[in-house]
């Protein structure tokens, strides 16, 4: 699963849950931790 966060910043830092994520256009996506 991937959580999606808006306001993507260069480097994709702390976009989702304070974890590194990939920037796709103006949206950033990062893996979600299911524990």
UniProtKB/Swiss-Prot annotation:
Domain of life where this protein originates: Eukaryota
Post-translational modification note: Contains 4 disulfide bonds.
Keywords in alphabetical order: Disulfide bond, Knottin, Secreted, Toxin
Gene Ontology MF annotations: toxin activity
Protein known as: Toxin CSTX-19
Cystine connections: 3-16, 8-21, 15-30, 23-28
Domain notes: The presence of a 'disulfide through disulfide knot' structurally defines this protein as a knottin.
Entry's Gene Ontology cellular component terms: extracellular region
Tissues of expression: Expressed by the venom gland.
Transmembrane segments: none
Subcellular location: Secreted
Recorded family membership: Belongs to the neurotoxin 02 (plectoxin) family. 07 subfamily.
